[in-house]
Structure formats: structure tokens, C-alpha cells
Amino acid sequence: MSESSRPAVVLSHRSYNAKTGLAIVCPMTRQVDKGWPFTVRVDQTSGIIADQVKSIDWRGRRARIKGRVDLAVLEQTITTFSRLILPATSA
């Protein structure tokens, strides 16, 4: 990994990742107490920045799996991102 490597959570399915060599990710941060509305907390010291979705060449970057997040955290990340792209529904 290069010095510029940063942790990220993969949103895309492994079949997409394998076929394309790309992965759709959200970066992680340690700045969880900033009050950013689109940061999903993973634990006391880290969060996922759900409004910074990126497509990366994981093969070219030699990305490696470092860990996993709970399914509930992944679902919350996707829900948080979807608020940016889907129209609000009236209750």
C-alpha cells in the first residue's frame, strides 16, 4: 500500500468488483465529532463519510481488506447516501 492509502468501506457487490476491477467505496474518518450530517459512526473513533462515494481501481491501488463493518452500519451508510439521491417521501 502506498503512503496515500486511506481506509474505506466497500459498498459494491464482490461480483461487480471482480468483473470490473473497480469498487464503489465511501472513505472513513476519525473526525466523528464534527457534527457532519452524512457521517455514519462505526465506533467511538471512526465513521464513514456517506456523501463522498467514489469508484476506485482496487487492483491498480493494490487495495486490501483490513476489516469489516457490521451489516447495520453498512445499511445505515447506504440509507444515509440514498437521502442525497432519492426524493423525500411524504409521510
Predicted regions: what they are:
Residues 1-91:
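Conserved functional hotspots at enzyme active or ligand-binding sites that engage polyanionic ligands
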